[in-house]
Amino acid sequence: MTKPVYSKTPSNPEKSCKSRGSNLRIHFKNTRESAMAIKGMLLTRAKAYLNNVLAHRECIPFRRFKGGVGRTGQAKIFGTSQGRWPKKSVEHILSLLQNAEANAEAKGLNVEKLKIAHVQVQRAQQQRRRTYRAHGRINPYMCSPSTVEFILTEVEKAVPKPAEESAQKKKSVATQEISA
């Protein structure tokens, strides 16, 4: 088996960890929406959020693949009206996040500061089955599995930007330099 190739390399490999699941038998559309919902979250918040989804306390907002998705009041927080609670996708994503957390601990990173920097969900190869129909016909019965990858990076303390001098100060300094 070949080494998994990630679609993105982290900017600081020493301060980041990765996790990847290939050909997972979970619906691509549900998994994509679930992964996009946690992108940019801290690891602790993402795990709490996904556990709340499993308990139906929060929902996953459906933005792209939303045809036929029912409405729920829990989606108002995200600025949309449609949402679901995709159990199987959330469980697989939680297991990948736990794997990434274990990888971070093995690297010696601070788990409390980990942020989900990169998420990618791709369609994996469809698996073919068949269903038998009337009059001796056979129709395909395909599944749409997913390949999911996460890159988590340790958040560094942001350095505050120095206050810029106002335009008036710059102008007065310029006139002083000319007169001097």
UniProtKB/Swiss-Prot annotation:
Q: Which of UniProt's keywords are assigned here?
A: Ribonucleoprotein, Ribosomal protein
Q: Kindly give the InterPro entries that the UniProt entry links to this protein.
A: Ribosomal_uL22, Ribosomal_uL22_euk/arc, Ribosomal_uL22_sf
Q: Name one GO biological process term.
A: cytoplasmic translation
Sorted alphabetically, the Gene Ontology cellular component annotations on this record are: cytosolic large ribosomal subunit; extracellular matrix
Q: Which cysteines are joined by disulfide bonds?
A: none
Give TM segment ranges.
none
Which superkingdom, per the lineage?
Eukaryota
Q: Where is the composition biased (Polar residues)?
A: 8-20
Listed GO molecular functions? structural constituent of ribosome
The segment annotated Disordered runs over: 1-20, 160-180
Q: Does the keyword Ligase apply?
A: no
UniProt-listed NCBIfam families: uL22_arch_euk
What family does the database annotate? Belongs to the universal ribosomal protein uL22 family.
Q: What is this protein called?
A: Large ribosomal subunit protein uL22
